[in-house]
Amino acid sequence: MTLGLMAQTQHMKFMGIPLNGTISTFQQKLVAKGCKHDVKRSKAVGVGCRTFTGTFFGEEAIIFVYYNAKTKVVYRAKACIERNSEDDIIRKYDEVKSALEEKYPDANIAKGECDGYESIGFYTVQGAIGLYVTRSDNYSYDYALHIDYSDDANDKKNENSKMNDL
């Protein structure tokens, strides 16, 4: 008898949760970590994204979880930390950047710019993490730090699903 071994896809993790499975399962895991579903904001962003409030990297954050509207499979999650001070947001950016560099020492790194601030992307076999700052005059805060995780395998499946509609 021949035994075959199947390679199992490793998925990018957000808050220790693999970016895989259905939005319902992912939501249960976030809630178990103390996050709260923000129903009002979720309705505003529409199908394909659910929002939560919770703690990320020791800070109050708004969490966005993106999923394929047809399959309900999660492929991306993002935490946004808000600040009213430019100095505060830059300090937090530097702190998170250092932590990501430590956690992902073998990642390919790409630097860029967003809203006049440095941005950085960490690329691994499992996916990518984008770190960037945005400015806003339309919200109750002036600056937001985005920590944006994307799972490579499920992001590709999501894109293929959309392309099948064409």
Predicted regions and their residues:
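Non-cytosolic coordination micro-motifs
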Residues: 8-47, 78-166
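Bacterial Sec-dependent N-terminal signal peptides
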Residues: 1-8
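Mid-chain, structured segments of secreted extracytoplasmic proteins
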Residues: 49-94
